[in-house]
Amino acid sequence: MPIVLICLMLVYAGLAVFVWHHQKKNARHYPLKTELAILAPALLVHGLVLILPVLHDHVLVMGFGYSVSLIVWLMLTMYWVGSFFYRLRGLQLLLYPCAAFSLLLAAVFPGHYVGYQISNWPFMLHVGASLLAYGL
């Protein structure tokens, strides 16, 4: 997984440079469709990196880097969905560097496996709701 995290970190850093370059030029036409077309597969891979360890080992992965990466994934997903309805130009200058840094944290602090089985639905619902509330 560290190779995938490094690749995603480079994609998010590249998107940050892409947005910064277009913001610096102050161009009237911004290639939003290009940005969202690059962001969609990156979000899909990022989501898979977050969910596959949980599904494979059937235990909850908790750690600083994992939690921060999950929260940033939620924020980027909200940005991606919101970009279809609202003009959110400029928000990416904060989100993409945060996403790259969160993936660095996830690689450095991968977390540990907690003994809570994911079959314990009330607890999983509680943890999921708390992460969603914090991330959104």
Predicted regions and their residues:
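Hydrophobic alpha-helical segments and helix pairs
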Residues: 85-134
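Membrane-interface helix-loop junction between the first two transmembrane segments
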Residues: 17-37
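Transmembrane helix-loop junctions in multipass membrane proteins, especially transporters and channels
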Residues: 23-28, 54-58, 87-88, 111-115
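A generic, lipid-embedded transmembrane alpha helix
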Residues: 38-54, 102-108
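Hydrophobic transmembrane alpha-helical segments in integral membrane proteins
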Residues: 1-13, 132-134
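Membrane-embedded alpha-helical segments in integral membrane proteins
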Residues: 13-23, 44-55, 128-129
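Cytoplasmic-side transmembrane-helix entry/capping segments in multi-pass membrane proteins
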Residues: 30-39, 65-66, 89-100
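Membrane-interface helix-loop-helix modules in multi-pass inner-membrane proteins
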Residues: 45-94
